[in-house]
Amino acid sequence: MTLSGKRISKGIGIGEVLCIRKNFDKIISREKIDFSQVDSEISKFNKAKSKAIEALRDLERKAMLQFGDDKKGIFEGQVLIVEDDELDELVIELIVKENYSAAYSIYLAFENLVKSVEDYKDPYLKERASDYKDIRNRLISIILGQVSDFSEINKDIILVTEELTPSDTMQFDLNYVKGFLTAVGGETSHAAILARTMGLPALVMTLSDIDALKDGDKIVIDAMSSIVIKNPSSDEINLYEGKILRQVELEKELFSLKDKDAETKDGTKVFLKANIGTPVDITYVNKYGVEGIGLFRTEFLYMRSLQPPTEDEQFETYKRVIETMEKKGVVTIRTLDVGGDKEIPYLNFKKEENPFLGFRALRMYKEYEELIQAQFNAIFRASHYGKIRVMVPMLTIYEEIETIEYFVNNAKINLKSRGLPFDENLEVGCMIEVPSAALISSKLANKLKFFSIGTNDLTQYVLAVDRGNQKISNLYDKYNPAVLKLIKKVLDDGVSSGIDVSVCGELGGDDAGALLLVGLGFRSLSMIPSATLRIKYLLKKYTIMELEELANKVLNSDSKQETLSYFDKFIGD
């Protein structure tokens, strides 16, 4: 029996199915409790909190031993959420005023938080909902007495679950985990990131296919072909064991490139940087030997608690990342990118019919001046401790330069008045992700020190396509000549003005996309850390002239199919 799925991490794995089921919504009682039970339920909640914090501290230690110091940050963040006073207030209010049980009150308290995050269009932010579900499930399982222990597993397994959370993976000896199958998640999900870090295959499948797999089923995950073979024959097992051996050899070759420069066959240097979303991701940065951070998303700081982060909290986070990256390249910090589709509950954004065209990112800064100024202050304070740059999202019109200058100047005045040191020459740049900004890039280059092109949003704005809409997904094409010509214009304008221009969208970490961008003239790309070794491997196979010829063909392509055929012939496997 063969099942299909969507690949989120390449590779091949063979093992027995081990299912993790979490259907708490189906087993928690919705019945009202008697008034006499209120104190007892509050006590259950408080005891569950204490046990959860104890367990999370233990997971911190395990994570540090298994993955290094930075990985423990996932569980440090979860402890902060469990300890949050506002969570206490929400749960206790539901117990006291609504007379719900502790378990159901916890479920409801997290439900709105989870839904608000799942509504995000940004895939990275959307998938942070798994952290909230992880905490919710832990608290409820403690109250219901359903805490599972998988620490004694000592055979090769494939983890199968509706959604993989950070805690799930820490319950296992990962030497025995050979792959992941989930019903929820994308390329930025915990399952995907962990799988790529470990070099394991992972697929997202339909819930019905997930349910068709039972504990003990022997399966093969072929994430190269995006299939799962249930109960494979001995011939199929032999075939895939051979493929796994060849895969191991290729991995060795890729990791031999870790400390070498990324360059073309004829020696043209290309800087490969990392996109990260939390300090935890520094683990992967170090593993793959990237040359700086091209995009440090800061939204996690605003999502890990039920209240906004303080200036000091942000400063400490930025400082830690900068010091960890010392001598490994510049850290580019993107200021807050929320609004519309990226709602944060305590900011009270109104629902909009067109969130992608609405009140978001730079457009909301003046209305939330105190919040944004605290971030600029924190970034400027951190600039004293290493080489960083600050990048503002979604600049649309030239006049918005004044908004950027307002916060920059206020940060400098504020820090000077407090006697705090900072880098007077801190570079300020912007994301180019709106066509209007791309079209005036020559003018913007006179005011800013660098551009970073966000190809994901730019593509859907240029083509007027919602990439999440399956009915028109065929129109979303990151290789479309109209998109590429606009990207090329921004590069040329930046180079003419003497400023740095890089790409931080998914195009830069895509095999064909990276080669194409270098052919267009880019010498700086930012991507998920695990993509860098593969890109290094590919770059050294081609000369600049060959890549320029490829780019020229794609720029003049008449169809998506024609473009893909060029890539197939050029790259092969």
Curated annotation (Swiss-Prot):
Report the family membership. Answer: Belongs to the PEP-utilizing enzyme family.
Matching NCBIfam families: PTS_I_fam
Gene encoding it?
ptsI
Q: Enumerate the active-site residues.
A: H190 (tele-phosphohistidine intermediate), C504 (proton donor)
Q: Which GO terms describe its cellular component?
A: cytoplasm
Q: Does the record bear Amino-acid biosynthesis in its keywords?
A: no
Please name the Pfam families in this protein's record: PEP-utilisers_N, PEP-utilizers, PEP-utilizers_C
**Which organism is the protein's source?**
Borreliella burgdorferi (strain ATCC 35210 / DSM 4680 / CIP 102532 / B31) (Borrelia burgdorferi)
Protein name per Swiss-Prot or TrEMBL = Phosphoenolpyruvate-protein phosphotransferase
Binding residue positions for Mg(2+): E433, D457
- Position of the signal peptide: none
| Compartment annotation | Cytoplasm
Q: What class of enzyme is it?
A: transferase
The UniProt function text for this chain reads: General (non sugar-specific) component of the phosphoenolpyruvate-dependent sugar phosphotransferase system (sugar PTS). This major carbohydrate active-transport system catalyzes the phosphorylation of incoming sugar substrates concomitantly with their translocation across the cell membrane. Enzyme I transfers the phosphoryl group from phosphoenolpyruvate (PEP) to the phosphoryl carrier protein (HPr).
What molecular functions are annotated in GO for this chain? kinase activity; metal ion binding; phosphoenolpyruvate-protein phosphotransferase activity
Name the Gene3D superfamilies for this protein.
Phosphoenolpyruvate-binding domains, Phosphohistidine domain, PtsI, HPr-binding domain
Top-rank taxon: Bacteria
